[in-house]
């Protein structure tokens, strides 16, 4: 397990979450906070560079390698790198040989051959697209790809995003992330902009099936255990820049540790309302 955190440094001065740090001191302060939490808790850190709209060129790669040294020297041994071409060069690994590299959820990895290609490039940890959790035959094929990678000496971990609450197959999501990752100055974050009126912020108000369309892991513990048994290694919990979602993620961790049957108890109330006691949501 690890604690992933927003990291702002050239060439990554923005990411898909959309928050703008007004000064360099703000960005450095966020890093120092993360380092302090890691020191106090013993939980390893994972630096997140979640912007596929930063040009994947050689100059930016070299800028990244130079600026990452501060984090590496302070004990960060895991990072989300958004560009396969950068990882494929091997430059990052040569400079930082102990670094474990994650891909980004923004690449929407959902095919076995994509998993094999990423493992061959040098990724250690593959974030799968959230839609995979609703397609068991596809998940089984991806797990077979993981086993194939192991047979070739490329051990990887597979991760599912557990509780982001985004709809599966959302037609707006890529544009939402692009908007945030390219916003500057005083531009509002996506969901505070007028264009978001055609997105999930409206759907959630008018579609009574909104909760059922969210690509979350179902709330029952047995469903989470089924994913582990199937070959998923990591559940990625949301909340990097959302205090309420962070609270929900911490509650899930506590419930898992306590062996509770229900990971998200709010669903109990929902089930009572629609007279669906113990009916699985799949």
Where are the regions a protein language model picked out?
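Active-site pocket-lining/capping segments in soluble small-molecule metabolic enzymes
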Residues: 1-114, 124-282
């Amino acid at each position: 397990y690890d604690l992933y955190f927003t990291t702002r440094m050239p060439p990554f001065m923005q990411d898909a979450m959309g928050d703008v740090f007004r000064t360099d001191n703000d960005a450095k302060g966020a890093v120092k906070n993360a380092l302090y939490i890691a020191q106090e808790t013993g939980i390893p850190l994972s630096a997140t560079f979640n912007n596929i709209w930063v040009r994947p060129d050689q100059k930016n790669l070299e800028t990244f390698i130079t600026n990452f040294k501060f984090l590496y020297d302070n004990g960060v041994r895991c990072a989300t790198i958004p560009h396969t071409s950068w990882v494929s060069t091997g430059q990052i690994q040569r400079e930082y040989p102990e670094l474990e590299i994650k891909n980004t959820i923004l690449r929407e990895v959902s095919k076995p051959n994509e998993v094999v290609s990423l493992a061959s490039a040098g990724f250690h940890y593959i974030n799968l697209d959230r839609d995979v959790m609703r397609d068991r035959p596809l998940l089984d094929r991806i797990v077979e790809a993981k086993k194939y990678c192991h047979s070739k000496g490329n051990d990887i971990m597979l991760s599912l995003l557990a509780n982001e609450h985004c709809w599966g197959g959302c037609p707006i999501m890529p544009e939402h992330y692009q908007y945030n990752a390219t916003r500057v100055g005083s531009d509002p974050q996506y969901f505070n902009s007028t264009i978001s009126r055609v997105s999930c912020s409206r759907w959630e108000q008018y579609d009574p099936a909104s909760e059922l369309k969210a690509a979350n892991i179902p709330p029952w513990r047995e469903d989470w255990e089924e994913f582990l048994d199937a070959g998923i290694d990591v559940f990625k919990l949301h909340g990097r820049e959302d205090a309420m979602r962070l609270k929900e993620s911490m509650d899930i961790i506590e419930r898992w540790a306590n062996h509770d049957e229900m990971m998200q108890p709010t669903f109990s109330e929902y089930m009572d309302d629609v007279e669906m006691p113990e009916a699985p949501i799949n």
